[in-house]
Amino acid sequence: MGRDGAGCMRRAGVALVVALALGGCVAQETRRDAVEEINRAFRAEYETVLGTRGTRVVAAAHPVVFEAVRATLVQLGMTVRQESPGLGLITADSPAPRPLSPAEWERAAAADLPKARALLARHVGALANLFTFEPEGLSIVINANVLETPGGTEVSFAMRMREVDAPKSDMPRREYPPPTAVAIGIDKLWETLDRELRSRGAAPSRR
């Protein structure tokens, strides 16, 4: 594939880049269908990860837990954009791949890439082998809900992706990080939160 093929490069949301991409090589509708199929599959896995790992309970007062959650996000390099102790909401973001390290992102991408390519191949054939995940041009958004509950405080984390650079094409955007990246990120949030809780004399979170 020559310069024309290289000029076909497209990015689709969370940083789906098809290296010599699909511009004049594959119909726009086909490209859109391919990315939307990946969106559906990864959304299902995303919801499974949050359902099994996203919520825990802390046996401590709400103000203590709220401040520990806030400190957790800051410690992981996130910028707090919105917080309301009354509503129990904290929203923070950071350029991708944080809160993952570059090595963690690469590990997650390697785990999820075979499935993404298999889904893409149904629509674009061998061009799916040029498909990869990259974090550039994206931010990771963490939403934390910190709510009083009988016996303590319930904490829930959600991790989404937002495009911060203007898209270079009209391809559909991906809203979900690779599922393995979500699992790694959520686990990292809990590990950091538990350290913060211990530093405040509170017990760690429990499932």
Regions found by a protein language model. Name each.
Residues 26-207:
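Ser/Thr-rich, low-complexity intrinsically disordered terminal regions
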Residues 22-24:
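C-terminal motif of bacterial Sec signal peptides marking the signal peptidase cleavage site
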Residues 2-14:
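Bacterial N-terminal signal peptides that target proteins for export
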